A protein has these predicted regions:
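Glycine-rich, low-complexity intrinsically disordered segments
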Residues: 1-173
Length: 173
């Protein structure tokens, strides 16, 4: 089983959109103490590419950041995320905390991805075929797509950082 990641999302008008999203009232018996104001990420996908000349392989422009996509269960935050999408609400910050198993066998936060001035650009609802026995352990899911002005990466364990801000001419902050 993959180790979890948790995300908190703050909107300019809505405030902490993920407040209470990972509680028993919101997700039933799958909640976990200590992460009440976050969503559990079921899957993650993000792609950054550099355009390049097909002949020489040399870069021809700045990096292209495709939407960052998280898959989550339908929870208390779902209506608020949909409202933020349809209103075009600015997401002031979206923070993903990544966990791994430590040498002591415990979950430890080791990596953080932070989006600033983000926007939810798409939400896809998903439900696996409920009569397929192979899918019976799945629940209702949604994929949330984020575009952003700035992204930062922080390896908390190794104390290394990186970032990209499209307002910065060089792309570094």
């Amino acid at each position: 089983m993959a180790t979890p990641a948790y995300m908190s999302i703050t909107g300019k008008q809505s405030g902490l959109i993920t407040a209470g999203a990972f509680t028993a009232e919101s997700v039933g018996n799958t909640y976990q103490e200590g992460h009440e104001d976050e969503i559990l990420i079921q899957a993650f996908e993000h792609e950054i590419v550099i355009p390049r000349d097909p002949q020489s392989g040399q870069p021809t422009g700045r990096s292209i950041h495709k939407p960052l996509v998280v898959t989550k269960v339908v929870d208390k935050a779902s209506p608020l995320l949909l409202q933020a999408l349809v209103n075009g609400e600015k997401i002031t910050s979206a923070v993903i905390k990544w966990y791994r198993t430590s040498a002591e066998g415990k979950q430890e936060h080791y990596f953080t991805t932070t989006l600033e001035d983000a926007l939810i650009v798409n939400i896809k609802g998903k439900m696996h075929h409920c009569q397929d026995d192979a899918m019976k352990h799945f629940t209702q899911l949604e994929e949330v797509y984020f575009s952003y002005r700035k992204i930062s990466w922080d390896h908390v364990g190794a104390n290394t950082v990186g970032s990209y801000d499209w307002r910065d001419e060089e792309g570094n902050s």
